């Protein structure tokens, strides 16, 4: 069982975003930063060196973007949560984004094995004029092998706050078995995805652009977050939801910052 910790602090120096502080304990590790989009946007890749999460693991991450910094954080590979040994596996993530800073939190998908027990909690605290774009893609069972999520449990809790006020609170729970088949659960799908953007106002034209993609899976798009956007996906294709979320990310970059997004090179193995 692992008790892994990761701490990252970003600061601005000479108009560049730098990682000012790194503290990591196994199995968590961070690659050296990349700057494919210029010095004020730091691409960061988090690795899980053990290859997967097992019952009893507790992984904690604390990430702080100081004022006027910009970062993109992704993972080196898909996450895996293995069948439980009777204990719950946990992942706890706290993110603080100071004034005029922005973070794109774009991890690769997580695969929840049949019989896994996993609980994750993500909290984001935003400063004034700061922005957040994050997604979560979760596959239940190794469906490529014919495996379904027939036993186990998955809990996900997202919280996004600004100045002590909640902007987005989302709690999900899925138990293996009948909830996979039911319409209020996965409707016999294997995969769900959520993308949340909070920053600048999102107009109807942008909403229509995001909706204007042909998907086999079910999807929903709304801007009821106020200055933000919410996208949901339920289906069976990892490639489809990744492509859609990637296109939404690129549209938001173009519309909100007048800048073309550059794909992190670790994604080229998708």
Curated annotation (Swiss-Prot):
Keyword annotations: Chaperone, Cytoplasm, Nickel insertion
GO cellular component terms attached to this protein's record: cytoplasm
Coiled coil: none
Keyword hit for RNA-binding: no
UniProt keyword Chaperone, yes or no: yes
Compartment(s): Cytoplasm
Main location: cytoplasm
InterPro entries: UreD
Molecular function via GO: nickel cation binding
Pfam families hit by this protein: UreD (PF01774)
Entries under PANTHER family matching the protein: UREASE ACCESSORY PROTEIN D
Family: Belongs to the UreD family.
Summary of subunit composition and partner proteins: UreD, UreF and UreG form a complex that acts as a GTP-hydrolysis-dependent molecular chaperone, activating the urease apoprotein by helping to assemble the nickel containing metallocenter of UreC. The UreE protein probably delivers the nickel.
Entry function: Required for maturation of urease via the functional incorporation of the urease nickel metallocenter.
Protein name, entry field: Urease accessory protein UreD
Organism annotation: Microcystis aeruginosa (strain NIES-843 / IAM M-2473)
Gene: ureD
